[in-house]
Amino acid sequence: MEKLNLLGFLIITLNCNVTIMGMIWLIVEVLLRMLVVVLAGSPIYEDEQERFICNTLQPGCANVCYDLFSPVSPLRFWLVQSLALLLPSVVFGTYTLHRGAKLAAVGGACRPQVPDLSTAYLVHLLLRMLLEAGLAFLHYFLFGFSVPARVSCSHVPCSGAVDCYVSRPTEKSLLILFFWAVSALSFLLSLADLLWILPRRKTLRTTQWVNGEARPVCEVPAPPPCLLQNPQGYLSQGQVDQEDRQEEQVVPEFPCMWTAGQSDNSNVGQACVSGLLEHSDQDASEATSSAGDRLTVAHTAHELRFHRETSLDLGGKNTQADELSLATQSHLARHSSASKPQAPCRLTTSGSAPHLRTKKSEWV
């Protein structure tokens, strides 16, 4: 990875600063409160005012009695209660993501440390518990614990005591009791979370004081900075240079020094084949030049023998002629070996050695 996975770091930051009790509370809040409000409360209270019937035909009396019975719709109150209790958690999550993103941006390629946000988590817990208690008190003041089947009303514009009847009172009472149970469970989970975080925060402070440095709760298992900066991975620069030198030493000076198994199916093998063809052409030219040299030597020897037979004495003439013949042959052999061009590369085949021995015997 060239860059740090920001999303993964933010998720780990939230995971390290939120306890298991906080996660359970969030599940209870979403599943047992908000979904029940939407799926169960909405069908029950959708015709609440229409089914609220009073035993009078006085205009406006039914509306006044219903307003006294239910100043606030329970469905709307429960929805507002759920959103209000989620507000501290949303604020804490936003603050955690902001701190995590800031640390990740400043850290760069170095390993970022998860910030310790136990103080902010404690403040958010206290605020959530206060909201839970306040909304529970308001819920009791508005709705109580049950829904009556009949309501008496004597306010203006009613002409006297008027009885009004509520639709589905038992079902509404059960739903109210369910939300009371959810509120109690939510408060207990918040209290357990508070008791969970206090010893943990005290232990963290003791650890920081003993070590003399601020330690995070947990760390992200990120790769070391050298891996992010060095494209060769965990190898150091010296190891990389050593490997490069070894690779340069392995490559031979001439492509033809490679064996046949290494040069097959490669461009280098084709280069070696072309080098071998050029070397065979050079061998043919060398053979032609050596044949010409042998003809010259033979012609010179024939002249020497003719001169020896016609001019000087047989004993002294033969000795001088042999010495002159040997000197001439050695001079021509040195001249032919000096004029021979070197092969561009050494052959590794087994057939080259006998060929060279044959040429050497021919020169001698």
UniProtKB/Swiss-Prot annotation:
GO terms for biological process: cell communication; regulation of satellite cell activation involved in skeletal muscle regeneration. Keywords: Cell junction, Cell membrane, Gap junction, Membrane, Transmembrane, Transmembrane helix. Residues 331-340 have a biased composition (Polar residues). The chain crosses the membrane at residues 20-40, 77-97, 129-149, 174-194. It comes from the Eukaryota. Residues 41-76, 150-173 are extracellular. One of its GO terms (cellular component) is connexin complex. InterPro entries: Connexin, Connexin_CCC, Connexin_CS, Connexin_N, Connexin_N_sf. It is found in: Cell membrane; Cell junction, Gap junction. Residues 331-364 are annotated as: Disordered. SMART domains: CNX (SM00037), Connexin_CCC (SM01089). The keyword Cell membrane applies. Residues 1-19, 98-128, 195-364 are cytoplasmic. It is a multi-pass membrane protein. Pfam families: Connexin. One gap junction consists of a cluster of closely packed pairs of transmembrane channels, the connexons, through which materials of low MW diffuse from one cell to a neighboring cell. Belongs to the connexin family. Delta-type subfamily. A connexon is composed of a hexamer of connexins. PANTHER family: CONNEXIN (PTHR11984), GAP JUNCTION DELTA-4 PROTEIN (PTHR11984:SF3). This is Gap junction delta-4 protein. It comes from Mus musculus (Mouse). The lineage of its organism: Eukaryota, Metazoa, Chordata, Craniata, Vertebrata.
